[in-house]
Amino acid sequence: MIASVVTRFAPSPTGFLHIGGARTALFNWLYARKHGGKMLLRIEDTDRARSTTAAIEAILDGLKWLGIDWDDDVVYQFSRVARHRDIAEQLLAEGKAYRCYATPEELAEMREKARAEGRAKLYDGRWRDRDPSEAPPDLKPTIRLKAPLSGETVIEDQVQGRVVWQNENLDDLVLLRGDGTPTYMLAVVVDDHDMGVTHIIRGDDHLINAARQKQIYDTLGWALPTMAHIPLIHGPDGSKLSKRHGALGVDAYRAMGYLPAALRNYLVRLGWSHGDQEIFSTQEMIDAFDLSAIGRSAARFDFAKLENLNGHYIRNCDDHVLVDLFQDALDYVPRGADLKPKLNDATRAQLLRAMPGLKERAKTLIELIDSARFIFADRPLTLDAKAIPLLTSETRALIGRLRTTLETVTSWSAQTTEAAMRTFAEQNNLKLGAIAQPLRIALTGRTTSPGIFDVLAVLGKETCLARLDDQSSP
């Protein structure tokens, strides 16, 4: 076991917890839990104009829903601005940073010139060794790091391998803006150091930041945490992930009826593998997870695969647990609020009895809820478009005769109603399917449902006879 592992998840509260962020949080959580360490949560809210309380709540709620818990109190980066500023001033006093008085116009000119010449280095270092007495009046300076001018900056990344940057291509990055606020680069380094972070696991879009941050670590004489830059998530065609491909917030997946355990399982396999195993319990994930098994190439998001996995979790879920998930989902899924007032002890018991048949067909909680609507339906039932043309006068007459037969069943169950219907079919020279479909339409308003005899048993004799009355003709 690695001693005292501390990971962190550090989202910016400028929007929802997106699917890539959720996977990053999961990887950090799994690594910390495997090694008996801590996963800390830091909200990087220094962008005051874009950070919102609603976004913070969405991030916290999304993590809780996914079952990703964090250790210690949440750290809010903005509350540590004074500490960040002190470090910048310390570097300035030690001659490791300097005040830069370049005007916005000068900086724009430098950038254009660098791009025209094909240089990565945008700032020309003009204030690095210049006498501050030459500073223009009334211009608030930035504080820049005195980055090394030659040599290499090297990261031994746990996923990307050895990554090397030539220092001549890296300019003196800004640590403190003219208004006294710290830059992201400085704040992240100071916070990770002060929080005791030992492992930084994040998206590989941060890899260039790693070079800048290592220079700050080196200048301060602080130990660099172990870094692991994980591949981004792409769409199924290899393009940048879009909303159409799954670039949605965790809250959207909740509203689409995915189970948190299924989404966790799906996310862990995006970029990480453990042989051919696809299904993992939470403990199996923790036991097996390792940074060395994360690939370098972008993972591809596949909605169909997620849906199939979700269906597996629904089918294998305990019925009582699934009823609880069903109830919780009513607050989030489309039209869920319509059913909420109708969920009482009686309908909950019916739902529990129906669950073995319902869950076999459902790939999402939305499908599960939709297929269970017959339990909660008001009389007379509203027939769906496919059912209406099948309810002919002959069919209605048949339903009336079926109702008369079912009324004679004394001990109501799936078995007794099936026996009565089979006897009716034989006596009238009918196939069972010719009876089942009219029954299904009359009892559920649809052409598809769980097994018709399960439907009869779940609804009970009184409700079934009443619904058959509504759709029958003498």
UniProtKB/Swiss-Prot annotation:
Chief localisation class: cytoplasm
Keywords: Aminoacyl-tRNA synthetase, ATP-binding, Cytoplasm, Ligase, Nucleotide-binding, Protein biosynthesis
GO CC term, one of those recorded: cytosol
InterPro entries tied to this protein: aa-tRNA-synth_I_cd-bd, aa-tRNA-synth_I_codon-bd_sub2, aa-tRNA-synth_I_CS, aa_tRNA-synth_I_cd-bd_sf, Glu-tRNA-ligase_bac/mito, Glu/Gln-tRNA-synth, Glu/Gln-tRNA-synth_Ib_cat-dom, GluQ/Sye
Entry's localization field: Cytoplasm
GO molecular function annotation: ATP binding; glutamate-tRNA ligase activity; tRNA binding; zinc ion binding
Ligand binding (ATP): 243
Enzyme Commission number(s): 6.1.1.17
This protein's record includes keyword ATP-binding: yes
Motif ('HIGH' region): 11-21
Catalyzed reaction equations: tRNA(Glu) + L-glutamate + ATP = L-glutamyl-tRNA(Glu) + AMP + diphosphate
Chain span(s) of sequence motif 'KMSKS' region: 240-244
Pfam families membership: Anticodon_2 (PF19269), tRNA-synt_1c (PF00749)
Enzyme class: ligase
Family: Belongs to the class-I aminoacyl-tRNA synthetase family. Glutamate--tRNA ligase type 1 subfamily.
Purpose of the protein: Catalyzes the attachment of glutamate to tRNA(Glu) in a two-step reaction: glutamate is first activated by ATP to form Glu-AMP and then transferred to the acceptor end of tRNA(Glu).
Name of the molecule in the record: Glutamate--tRNA ligase
The organism's taxonomic lineage, starting at the top: Bacteria, Pseudomonadati, Pseudomonadota, Alphaproteobacteria, Hyphomicrobiales
